[in-house]
From Swiss-Prot:
One of its GO terms (cellular component) is cytoplasm. It is found in: Cytoplasm. Transfers and isomerizes the ribose moiety from AdoMet to the 7-aminomethyl group of 7-deazaguanine (preQ1-tRNA) to give epoxyqueuosine (oQ-tRNA). Its EC number is 2.4.99.17. It comes from Borrelia garinii subsp. bavariensis (strain ATCC BAA-2496 / DSM 23469 / PBi) (Borreliella bavariensis). This is S-adenosylmethionine:tRNA ribosyltransferase-isomerase. Disulfide bonds: none annotated. The keyword Cytoplasm applies. The gene is queA.
Amino acid sequence: MKTKEFHFNLPYSLIAQYPSEKRGSSRLMVLDPKLQKIYHENSVNNILKYINSDTFIIFNNSKVRKSRMYAESELGNNIEFLILDRIGTDLFTALISKSKKQIVGNVYKFPEGLMGEILSKNNSEIVLKFDNNVDEDYFEKHGFVPIPPYIKRDYDKIDEDRYQTVYSKYVGSAASATAGLHFSRDLFSTFEKNNIEYDFITLHVGLGTFLPVRSKKVEEHNMHFETFLIEDCVATRLENAKFLGKKILSIGTTTLRALESSYDNKLKKFKTGQQSTNLFIYPGKNYCFKFVDMLFTNFHTPQSTLLMLVSSFAGKDFVFSSYEEAINKGYKFFSYGDAMLVLNHI
């Protein structure tokens, strides 16, 4: 399958540059792939029209690290880093700006005199070794929230709150699992009042989620691994919910990939604990969804693995016709944009 089949033209004016005024106030497009119907809601809070106590909602509670860092090169140039994964107390994978000019052995001066050296390099991806142990407080103090490059404005303090979910808990993501940004504490209270169960897994968002597909053929894309955690108690609740016939609603593609990677359809059990996945779901792969019944997600970038996953879940033609309708109706796209609820998969 050709990657360009997942391209679409989007007016720049529809790329959300700021979050909605309040969490939950974004618009919601609802897709029913089986009936081939599309519904429109003026607020994500209206999700209650489509779910009930027979729904079990599962979220990704990874917290975004302030992973955009700036350092001075030996030549005095300002170099930007995006910290990805911690692989040791003083070792991280990262992306580096002006990558063609940066070579193994280069040393950079970070805030507080911390020095970092490139140990290895693969295109713009590097392994960075600091001359001291680095804890999360350091990034919290000196880093910046890594808002995506299509948000073309200066860094704003609002991003420190709104690019993070209200339930984020474990630091490790280099980008937000943006589907969760729509859910307010009030909406969680409403779930509880309506006896709608929910729980959390943790998948740290990295290159596997946000790296674009650059190969001409979809099948040739190299999906990066991302780490995730499913606790025993969460797995038990999920398994019981499925056994009782409840619909499993995944909040975001990251959550879906973790669940689908870990679930054994024969044993009807999850593998629990720390794991990793490079699961790449796309139309034409004939992937059979084992566990997730419903998907809540954002409107994704062209030719992204996220758009391909949604296209596999709901049907490529139906998804692209819904995107066309969203554009015509002025929906906002990408991280701070509006949301989509897919009621079932094909």
